[in-house]
Amino acid sequence: AALALGAALGETAIPLSTVAKTAANQIFGAGYPVDAIDAGIVWNYRLARAAVAACCGVALALSGVVLQALLRNALADPYILGISAGASTGAVAVAILGLGAGLVSLSMGAFAGALLAFGVVALLARAAGSGAGAIILAGIAGSQLFNAITSFIVARSANAEQARGIMFWLLGNLSGARWPDVTLALPVVVLGAVVCLWQ
């Protein structure tokens, strides 16, 4: 229902019936008569954005629950533990170094940065002592470290236009999300959910 509502609302209001007919035409090959412009807006833009947003929401909720369960601390999340900051650093490094600015290369860079940040936080926590409190404090320190590295990379390595694009990307925006993004996000989210539920 939320996906359908997200596809119906926007600058151009589209009835829910049109959203349902468009989805049925695209998914099941139904032959409902739908205005071509409305169908293009719904399928190519709004439903794709709504699906990516849903995948992101599920992934964030799942990662938060897993971290809170592992650390037995309600404060634990990817932002406080520095994982999100490390992912940002990895993606920015990939973009700046010209290793590819495509969806897969940015995602792999972000994943590598997140793993590196997690390793750094684990080392800091081990040095600080055992306990969930030490992990949280190490995560905050790691988050600040990787945020500083990201800012340094952007300031030293990018021209003004590139820096603007990177900062816009870091702030997060789903306006450019399309179906290839869904095909990348959905399997990862489903696999992660299955693994977490199985454990």
Spell out what each predicted region is.
Residues 1-199:
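Alpha-helical transmembrane segments in inner-membrane proteins
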